[in-house]
Amino acid sequence: MSHSDLRLTDFRRIVIKVGSSLLIDSAAGKVKSAWLAALADDIAALHRAGKDVLVVSSGSIALGRSRLKLPSGTLKLEESQAAAAVGQIALARIWAKVLDHHGIGAGQILVTLRDTEERRRYLNARSTISKLLEWRAVPVINENDTVATSEIRYGDNDRLAARVATMTSSDLLILLSDIDGLYTAPPGINPNAKLIPVVESVTADIEAMAGAAGSELSRGGMRTKIEAAKIATSAGTHMLIASGKIDHPLQAIIDGGPCTWFLTPANPVTARKRWIAGSLEPKGVLVIDAGAVKALDAGRSLLAAGVTRIEGTFARGDAVVVRGPDGHEIGRGLVAYSADNAERIKGKSSAAASKILGLTGRPEMIHRDDLVVSHHHDNGHNNGSHGVSTPAPEPSA
């Protein structure tokens, strides 16, 4: 794939990361309102074109520091957490206001490292974000600095943005930066430094080009952006770094402005399913009936109605093996219910399952995006199979 083949408007689900130094005027201690309004114009244009847009926004600690009139310098952990508590309110209000100008709702999501590393919490966070996107809102995501400690934090929003992109099967991650891409050397030091327009894969040479640049307002430099690229591209998400120091930075990318693309050979769904199939140890087994086998072969989700037996002890979000009535493995997936709850609702319709559990959560035992079908049957057409859920369109590059 060449640089000319890459068009921002071809992507369906886009995560945009905005750093503190772009959003906050450190001298005045205020948000750069005109710049943010221009960025919101760009986001609204993508939204009108039918794109799913997510924002990962830094700035809560910087805003809190300003609102509390704290002196410059490094903050202790508890000081950062207290500043974030004040700043998170301000940050949410700011994003809600600029997006509301375009008739777009904003939803605040505060996450910690464990929300994307532990599968149960991962599923909860992902389902919340998915519902916001379904309602055509823009999720505004930040690390929950009020509760994150040094041991369980990302420490930068570049890697958080990459995790969000992979969690939501986004096909593009945009890191808006104070530099317009990856250079062969630090451009502020070496006048001969050249912008690299496309990175096919993150090699040791590419990593060596990443300087350690950072600022008091921002915890991340180019090194964390390269780490983000490794996370994103390994999960099937393309990434680009572009300058956010101009008005309408997304439109500038569309118009062919300078940036660096990091390419992935896979799409998000393929990469995610490879991870489920090969990297996770199954904790249990779901045995399903013939109708559900047909449903899975047709690309549907697995509903409780099609499950006949539960084996093993597992929690929500654990990997399980799916077997057909003859005992052969049909596939593997991330189960949406614990073994106890799965046992209670097996063979039941979605309405009955919801009544038994006293909730109206996901009707699927395993969602199709969390399921890898490894053995296909010659089932012809799916006529009246139970255990069936109509598939939703998958994001694709």
Swiss-Prot record:
Pfam families in alphabetical order: AA_kinase, PUA
Q: Region Disordered: which residues?
A: 374-397
Instruction: List ligand-binding residues for ATP.
Output: 17, 177-178
Cellular component (GO) terms are: cytosol
- What start and end residues bound the annotated signal peptide? none
Q: Which UniProt keywords apply?
A: Amino-acid biosynthesis, ATP-binding, Cytoplasm, Kinase, Nucleotide-binding, Proline biosynthesis, Transferase
Task: Give residues annotated as binding substrate.
Answer: 58, 145, 157
The answer to whether the entry has keyword Zinc is no
- Quote the subcellular location field of this record: Cytoplasm
Per its record, what are the GO molecular function terms?
ATP binding; glutamate 5-kinase activity; RNA binding
Entry-linked Gene3D superfamilies: Acetylglutamate kinase-like, PUA domain
Associated pathway = Amino-acid biosynthesis; L-proline biosynthesis; L-glutamate 5-semialdehyde from L-glutamate: step 1/2
Q: Which SUPFAM superfamilies match?
A: Carbamate kinase-like, PUA domain-like
Tell me the GO BP annotations in alphabetical order: L-proline biosynthetic process
What EC number(s) has UniProt assigned to this enzyme?
Answer: 2.7.2.11
Every copy of the PUA domain together lies at: 283-360
According to its UniProt record, this protein's enzyme class is transferase
User: Reaction(s) catalyzed by this protein?
Assistant: L-glutamate + ATP = L-glutamyl 5-phosphate + ADP
Q: Which HAMAP family match?
A: ProB
Role noted for this protein:
Catalyzes the transfer of a phosphate group to glutamate to form L-glutamate 5-phosphate.
Q: From the Swiss-Prot or TrEMBL record, give the protein name.
A: Glutamate 5-kinase
